[in-house]
C-alpha cells in the first residue's frame, strides 16, 4: 500500500538499501556481471555503490542517493510558503549528495573516469530535481562538480551513450562536452517520459 511504502522510506537505512538494490537491478538488467562491480572500494576505505567497466577498463562510478525527508515534506506542504522552504532544504540535501560523490568517488588516479553518475531511484524525486526547483539549476551545479544525474528511466540510455563515446574519444579531454551532450539526452528522455505520463492521465480521464 502507499502507506506502507511511505513508512518504509521513513527509515533511512531501509531507504538506502532500497536505493542500492534498485541501482544493482538496473545495472544487472543491462550488463553482464563481468562488466560491473557492486560496492567498489577505494584506497580511502570509501565504497561506491557500483562501478561500470568501460571498454578501456576505466571505471565509471555510480552511486545511489535518495533524498526523501524534505522531498516528502515539500510534497505534503499545505501552502506555497512552506513548499518554498522545504524546496530550499531539499536542494541543500541534493547539493550535499552531489558534493559527496564528487569528492569521494571521482578518482582518476585510482582508475575512474573524471566524472560520476548519481542514480536517483525514485522518478518523482528525480523529476523534482530536474524540472521543479525554483531559481536553482541542479543539473548545472552537478555538471560543475562533474556529476551526472540519472534515474531508472534514463540510466540505460545514459550509460549506453557513455560507452559509445569511450570507444571513440579520450574521455579526459572531452569530459565537459560529453557531459553536456549526455544531459541533453537525459533531459529529452525525462521530458518524453513526462509527456507519456500526461498522455496516460489524459486518456484515463
Regions found by a protein language model. Give the residues of each.
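Amphipathic, heptad-repeat alpha-helical coiled-coil/stalk segments that mediate oligomerization
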Residues: 1-205
Amino acid at each position: 500500500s502507499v502507506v506502507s511504502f511511505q513508512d518504509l522510506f521513513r527509515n533511512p537505512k531501509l531507504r538506502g538499501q532500497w536505493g542500492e538494490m534498485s541501482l544493482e537491478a538496473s545495472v544487472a538488467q543491462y550488463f553482464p556481471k563481468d562488466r560491473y562491480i557492486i560496492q567498489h572500494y577505494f584506497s580511502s576505505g570509501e565504497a561506491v555503490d557500483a562501478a561500470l567497466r568501460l571498454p578501456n577498463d576505466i571505471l565509471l562510478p555510480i552511486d545511489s542517493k535518495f533524498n526523501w525527508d524534505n522531498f516528502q515534506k515539500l510534497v505534503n506542504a499545505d501552502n506555497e510558503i512552506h513548499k518554498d522552504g522545504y524546496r530550499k532544504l531539499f536542494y541543500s540535501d541534493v547539493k550535499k549528495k552531489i558534493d559527496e560523490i564528487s569528492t569521494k568517488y571521482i578518482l582518476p588516479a585510482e582508475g575512474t573516469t573524471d566524472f560520476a553518475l548519481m542514480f536517483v531511484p525514485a522518478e518523482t524525486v528525480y523529476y523534482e530535481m530536474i524540472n521543479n526547483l525554483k531559481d536553482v539549476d541542479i543539473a548545472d551545479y552537478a555538471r560543475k562538480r562533474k556529476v551526472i544525474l540519472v534515474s531508472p528511466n534514463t540510466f540505460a540510455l545514459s550509460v549506453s551513450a557513455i560507452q559509445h563515446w569511450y570507444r571513440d574519444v579520450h574521455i579526459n579531454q572531452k569530459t565537459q562536452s560529453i557531459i553536456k551532450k549526455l544531459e541533453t539526452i537525459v533531459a529529452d528522455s525525462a521530458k518524453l517520459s513526462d509527456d507519456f505520463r500526461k498522455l496516460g492521465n489524459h486518456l484515463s480521464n
